[in-house]
């Protein structure tokens, strides 16, 4: 069994529920509106919207890529997939929460389909790297699709099979992306929300494989 002290050194190992930090009951306080488009960050929304959750490395660049898509109403940076309730960024970086960095996407399905969002997801990062994304190493950077409906789950799995076929043709490895029913998403601190709009010269490690998902 991996010790807690070893996880602090080796960020590629997920903690157990017993090893995870305890967290807290109070969620992060968020601004009411999206910094980029002025829409409500979490609602209420005037249009028919659906929700999607993606993790593709550092959420700064991931969130920007997703808010740039026409039909996306709002995006929120957060943490999901682990054990610690309402973690801080520092706690997530320790490797002792089990969470990965994610983006909650609010979108209008009449303007952008879930399949279109999946295409953006697969092509924007390298989903074969396990507990890392480029130079960002650790469990918090693992690739995930957390699905809010059975239809999303089926579509995500089908798209993974299709993208794996294209990766294999290109001589690349196997997909390591977690595809699961959506767990609780804990919101990240305000300074992480729409970070690259507030800090245009900020770090962005987002980078794809050059492989495209067939339409």
UniProtKB/Swiss-Prot annotation:
InterPro entries: Met_Sox_Rdtase_MsrA_dom, Met_Sox_Rdtase_MsrA_sf, MsrA_MetSO_reductase. The active site is at 58. One of its GO terms (molecular function) is peptide-methionine (S)-S-oxide reductase activity. Signal peptide: none annotated. SUPFAM superfamilies: Peptide methionine sulfoxide reductase. The keyword Oxidoreductase applies. Its EC number is 1.8.4.11. GO terms for cellular component: cytoplasm. Keywords: Oxidoreductase. GO terms for biological process: cellular response to oxidative stress; protein modification process. It catalyses: L-methionyl-[protein] + [thioredoxin]-disulfide + H2O = L-methionyl-(S)-S-oxide-[protein] + [thioredoxin]-dithiol; [thioredoxin]-disulfide + L-methionine + H2O = L-methionine (S)-S-oxide + [thioredoxin]-dithiol. Pfam families: PMSR. The keyword Metal-binding does not apply. Belongs to the MsrA Met sulfoxide reductase family. PANTHER family: MITOCHONDRIAL PEPTIDE METHIONINE SULFOXIDE REDUCTASE (PTHR42799:SF2). Has an important function as a repair enzyme for proteins that have been inactivated by oxidation. Catalyzes the reversible oxidation-reduction of methionine sulfoxide in proteins to methionine. This is Peptide methionine sulfoxide reductase MsrA. It comes from Pseudomonas syringae pv. tomato (strain ATCC BAA-871 / DC3000).
């Amino acid at each position: 069994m991996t010790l807690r002290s070893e996880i602090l050194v080796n960020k590629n190992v997920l903690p157990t529920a017993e090893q995870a930090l305890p967290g807290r009951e109070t969620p992060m306080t968020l601004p009411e509106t999206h910094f980029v488009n002025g829409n409500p960050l979490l609602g209420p929304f005037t249009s028919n919207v659906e929700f999607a959750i993606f993790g593709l490395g550092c959420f700064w660049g991931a969130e920007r890529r997703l808010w740039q898509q026409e039909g996306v109403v709002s995006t929120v940076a957060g943490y999901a997939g682990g054990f610690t309730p309402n973690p801080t960024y520092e706690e997530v970086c320790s490797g002792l929460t089990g969470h990965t960095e994610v983006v909650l996407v609010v979108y209008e399905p009449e303007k952008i389909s879930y399949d279109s969002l999946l295409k953006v997801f697969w092509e924007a990062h390298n989903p074969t790297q396990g507990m890392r994304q480029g130079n960002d190493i650790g469990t918090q950077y693992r690739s995930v699709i957390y699905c809010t409906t059975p239809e999303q789950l089926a579509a995500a799995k089908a798209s993974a099979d299709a993208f794996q076929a294209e990766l294999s043709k290109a001589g690349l490895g196997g997909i390591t992306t977690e595809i699961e029913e959506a767990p609780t998403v804990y919101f990240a601190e305000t300074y992480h929300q729409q970070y690259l709009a507030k800090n245009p010269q900020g770090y962005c490690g987002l980078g794809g494989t050059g492989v495209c998902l067939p339409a």
